[in-house]
């Protein structure tokens, strides 16, 4: 500071305003961390020091989280206590002082430049901190210390003042126009005359220029200013003083209390300073505490004369011509001070504001919304949603039929049942539409998924597309740091679907709320946290708030937030209706006076969030910015569901504080606005209070979207719909109109015009304020009392992008299905036509770097948008699913170079340029001549270039191109180089470093220049095969020429002298060309350099290839060290280039690779094409002379992309990202299918009848089809009916029809169920009324009988009706038997609605002849020729087959032909039993037809009486008249077909002479009674929901062994069998996944159908069972697409070799044929007890118990891989603790083809039966018995992982006890058996496993798996077997250990770690811990293993010596992808060990 200039720091008094100052501080604090910390610390100090104060003081402050909240309380009101005023003005001054100290540290100077300090009244307190502020840190500390002092001072003055007068009012007045002494005298006289006690008298406290301040009690001051003669007429002002000051009598004790006892107070004061404002400014103080006492005394007790202070100051500074006054905070005395100082002729500068600071680019704490998507009523996307808003549409409608039957629940008034008085809602058009294949979800699982979850998946993907999210190799966001927040609060879909679909393996994840968010993370492979939130109507706002919090806390880097609501459960309507919140008249009437509740609605929405700074850095489109968000609760509301306006206002203010904005900055408010009578006024009241003091004339516009689309209360219209609307307002720059307006407003609203709030009825421009963003306040509150709020800002980014230097660009699109493929292209094309001005570079950038890529791909390179449009229009073909091919880098040799060959890339590609420059630098350092111009300059003179320059330039170019390819993710699988190109190949493979390869090429070229004469030799290219070329050369008189290159099968190069080559060319007949090279490379001309070159090459390092090299010298692949060395390089220089041999070596090792040439132009590509003939699209050239480099590169990238290459698009575009913009291109074209279930109420749930009897539930539709349980409306119509077998009428039908003494449902019941169901459907969906006679049954087929044994007496018959074809009058009907979760397919038929008159007319033409035949049979019987039977005899004979109750016995007399081929009868139908209801009575149907059954089964000529003919269907049943009971009818039966095991009959029914019914093709098949008994009495214990197949009657034949040594050429005769196999595979996949066979295209990925590893095992087992062919569960890996299955399993009629047959023969040599050809054998129902040998040798019976709730234990052996019957002993691998062999599905194939069978746990499906009484011994008994049955002879090879290893050992023991030998045993990571039971530790073992497994989705278990794991843990803990005797031990045992323990997985679980420590369970290894019996079945696996822990670890006591292997993984990682290949290696070594001789 200049010596003639002085700084003055001015601190004003306590009455100054703090309003602007406090806002400015907090605004600056947003970008100044230390300032934010100070304000937080200051707040804490104030709050701490006021905790114990009295209620008056505490209440004056209230609750505040920060000082800005405190400021809000008094921004527009007066602080009658004064403490808040004191705190806030102090905070302003302290903050500004600290800022100045930071900005200008010299202000704390202690030398002659020390500023002067001036404090006016209470300003002295703020000033005092400077006395101890040698540094900024000390100043900071002192400010906090004085804050505590200020709090105590306020308390002292308040208490003192209130002791005089406890009332509100001003304690200070300013009086003008009277001197101080005159005023004192006047006050004394008047107060004395009024008798005012001295202690209460007002006094002069402060004197200024022509004014004085008097201080005293408010009542005294009021009296004085109004009545005192000397004052009452003078000008005067009331001051913001609310306690005594300058007039208080204080004692030393008072001052000590105020100053406090901090250690800082004792700090000595060494500074010399003047305290202007004190009576004695120059007084000296020993300590800071002394000074503070003096200051407090001055401010409290001593009057102040400001004029005197200023005069003294001016006098002292008279020698300083320049003064700099800095006002620390506001000061009302500043102008007086400066005027006095200026009056002496000095220059005075004034700084009355904060110190200068650099404003932040963005305010911190901002969150960018970078992507959004949504769908709801009337809209499938946000654009359509915006159109709904702009059109003011009200989308309320009556509840549609596809949700539920409204008539069942709607009542005009509520009654006691489940009723609703509203009919309305707002609904999505197609809530069930879902692209399941895109998300790899089977139709079966998709239907079980909550539609909200499905829709959320799709909107999330759409939002991610808008956000430009890409999952490529280079990612802007780490997937481990992406979080998902999903709002949901109901489980409607579970209630809708459960009683229709029952329970399934996918039910839990389908409807459980946590899966809404979890499935998002799973689908996109994210590892960040997932949250499923329920905060009722504010769930979305809450999810966004939590997402923002997580992002700001840096816990995550990207968040997906949103919610979904799809309403369809009627009881939600009924409960809400009864609670009175729903409108009975329609939609939400937001703001209106007729508001009467809200309207329920669908909506789904998603937003993608990032921190603003990250979004800018990632080049994202920022749709809007979340400036702040918040949530609180209406804790003081009148009820939990009532909103509290005060709580809402508090939240608004808090959020604005956090955002550093004020109510003046808000442009629009999107209100919750549900239209309820209480909620709307409360919300508007909160806004009115918030905006009551706005300073801007512009109105606040408010609106609410619920008036358009209703209120999806549980999840989103309360949040995400409003949010999407707000974002669109920013995007469109429009304030939209409010639906339902204009209209009279809610009368409970405050007067909106007075508070400047406006509700628009027409759209208007959304204008931007000057120099600040537009801001929207979005408000939500929920039904549970919560409030949520979001403050949005728009983001102005008007940066103009420069042009991309690249002139050609690659544009792509991709999909998962062909339909989506064409849809994506069409949508892109449409968008381009609508946006022709879009830049091609932005389209390319968006479609490549900012998209996720899928298998079916399109790519094209274009230079303009118009060119792109043309190419899109021209391409209409399908695209196959891409499969990634290996890439071969093919490096060009010399001879193709040209000037400027890399000039375009050098200018535009940083990677290429940097690599080329590096090569040039290295070459310069090695003293090689410059060559860069050859690459970079098109006008470079080529004729002047030497071989040295050319070869270095070509090599550098190729290395640069390779670097460019590798930088964008294209890595070669193998490299090959032609001649010089091999050097580039060796560098790229890692053999030669960059310096070495340049050195070798440069030195070799120098040697050539030195030793070889230029232009004396030549090279001739000839179009001849190498053999012909060689023969031609041999025939020459002078064979000096030689072959230099074998380029292709028909192209060679000859080298020799120019003379010889010229002569040779003249004699050639083949086409030839002289090459433009100066030397004869690869010829004898190179001989002079070889020795020296080899010596030079000996000095470089040759490393092992990291990438295989196809050597053109050796014609083989090289991937190991030792091949490349100096000698090789010399030979490579001299010997021919065998390019063909190298190509063939690649072809033999790599399947269908992509050939990518890297060089100056296309040269080697033609050689590849001529030699190998690959597809043209797989031969690529990086550069093409004469073509722009980016065009040729683009073509290469397009082809690579279409062939499945993973290109790092983000890396490609990164250098140019500042020139690129992310476009909002069309979203993915979904391939949608319908997954929807209509809710149908069961009978006992329907509303009961009302008292007036007008509203009752409907009776049963039919006894056989009682109620509708599902109704899906057209076009995908499906109606499902149920009928309970326990219904008395139904039960009588079954009980009255007995086969072999078992009740069996009559076949006529199925006809009745079908006819009744179709009749119902027709009446429901057709305008015409169709009667029964018009319905015809066709092709009825029954698969199995319906019995009580099948489903129990409480089972159900399910009838399903669906469209049967293109005709609307044809239906397919299917029947199932159901019990709980189990269902069985019973049969199906077609039902057609026909014209009965046409049928009758057709019959009338022939009925006479049939009726005549009836008469003939009757006459013949009466004459004794045929048989005449009375009913007693007929039904008595028939009882041998079937016994009927009386209701069925309607035959009055029967007439049977003598050959039993015809029969007739007279029938009189009985009335149906009371209580039944039929459309076509089964009693009548059975009675009219069962004569046919009698004829077939009672025929005396039948050869066997041990069989029964069962009716299993008919061709058709037609009827034109409804029969009547009591009326006689004639029936006629004729046998029309009779084969060995089947009989076909026709049945005709006559009413007199009129034919009224005809059953054609009634089919009976013969069944052995033994089989029939089993069929009728069998029980199926499966707990799955899928239909079980009918029993297979015939046995499989065991194929004979095949002599695999014999080669047979024959035409396959198995095409029909193969077709059956393929058909079975596809049908079973279809059934298991729920997919439609029609959707199975060749490119359909099986994983896309939802087939996971567990389902794969089920499918493989069923295929094996059905076809006899062993399909391995790994088929989903081996054959990933449907086309792969078709190629492998399709019928073949080609020559085949038996040893290569793809079918898998059975075990036929050393394995029992009991396994036959089945890869999956089940062994059911073992004995109910198993025998176990205990330690003592006694026999113990272990009772499994009845446990009727779970199936019996069952062993399943499944072929996992290998070839049965190949002479190898099978390896049996027992399932681990999960119980399922799915654990092993990731094991790669073993080259040995050893057959590996997996053995599931017998308790997999019944883990509750796996008790400790059963234990390891009991479980192993099941396995042992199954193995002995499967393999009666030979030795065994066993193994198991984890708990499976323990079972394997016990099976080994039991086999030994049965005298069966185990040859080899493989134990994978399992401790040896413990010598004792670990007490009370099993629970900790399970806790350990739960903690470690939940971190890995691959090990997340189902409930059943979890139960099995717990059971195996308990079993292992209690298993203490005897060691095997030496004679019983396996010959060889191998043990494989996991080297890593699982403790790292536990480290993040603090609770578990504490529990481990408490239990004393070790987490570190110690000697022999693996054998410690104190460690339970899991705890042993916690510590990491040392080398000493990788031995047998106790197993040697049980099995003897063992080979011990280990792998670097932990226990759970071993069988999982990423580590399973290591396990495969160790198992391979174990198998080799097993097979070793000896």
Swiss-Prot record:
Malonyl-CoA:ACP transacylase (MAT) domain: annotated span: 888-1172
UniProt enzyme class: transferase
Gene ablation phenotype (knockout): Results in the loss of zearalenone production but still produces beta-zearalenonol.
Region ranges (Disordered): 1700-1738
Induction of the gene: Expression is positively regulated by the zearalenone biosynthesis specific transcription factor ZEB2. Conditions for carbon-, nitrogen-, or phosphorus-starvations lead to very low expression. Increase in pH results in gradual reduction of the gene expression.
Keywords: Multifunctional enzyme, Phosphopantetheine, Phosphoprotein, Transferase
Active-site feature positions: 537, 672, 711, 979, 2021
Modified residues (O-(pantetheine 4'-phosphoryl)serine): 1653
Biased composition (Polar residues): 1709-1737
Pathway assignment: Mycotoxin biosynthesis
Region of interest (Product template (PT) domain), ranges: 1221-1572
Domain Ketosynthase family 3 (KS3): 364-794
One record GO biological process: zearalenone biosynthetic process
PKS/mFAS DH domain segment(s): 1254-1573
Residue numbers spanned by region C-terminal hotdog fold: 1425-1573
Molecular function per GO: 3-oxoacyl-[acyl-carrier-protein] synthase activity; fatty acid synthase activity; phosphopantetheine binding; polyketide synthase activity
Matching Pfam families: Acyl_transf_1 (PF00698), CurL-like_PKS_C (PF22621), ketoacyl-synt (PF00109), Ketoacyl-synt_C (PF02801), PP-binding (PF00550), SAT (PF16073), Thioesterase (PF00975)
Swiss-Prot/TrEMBL domain comment: Multidomain protein; including a starter unit:ACP transacylase (SAT) that selects the starter unit; a ketosynthase (KS) that catalyzes repeated decarboxylative condensation to elongate the polyketide backbone; a malonyl-CoA:ACP transacylase (MAT) that selects and transfers the extender unit malonyl-CoA; a product template (PT) domain that controls the immediate cyclization regioselectivity of the reactive polyketide backbone; and an acyl-carrier protein (ACP) that serves as the tether of the growing and completed polyketide via its phosphopantetheinyl arm. The release of the polyketide chain from the non-reducing polyketide synthase is mediated by the thioesterase (TE) domain localized at the C-ter of the protein.
NCBIfam families given in the database record: PT_fungal_PKS
Function text: Non-reducing polyketide synthase; part of the gene cluster that mediates the biosynthesis of zearalenone (ZEA), a nonsteroid estrogen that is a contaminant of cereal grains and causes estrogenic disorders in humans and animals. The ZEA backbone is synthesized from a single acetyl-CoA molecule and eight malonyl-CoA molecules. The reducing polyketide synthase ZEA2 is proposed to synthesize a reduced hexaketide intermediate by using different combinations of its reductive domains during each round of condensation.
Protein name as it appears in the record: Non-reducing polyketide synthase ZEA1
Originating organism: Gibberella zeae (strain ATCC MYA-4620 / CBS 123657 / FGSC 9075 / NRRL 31084 / PH-1)
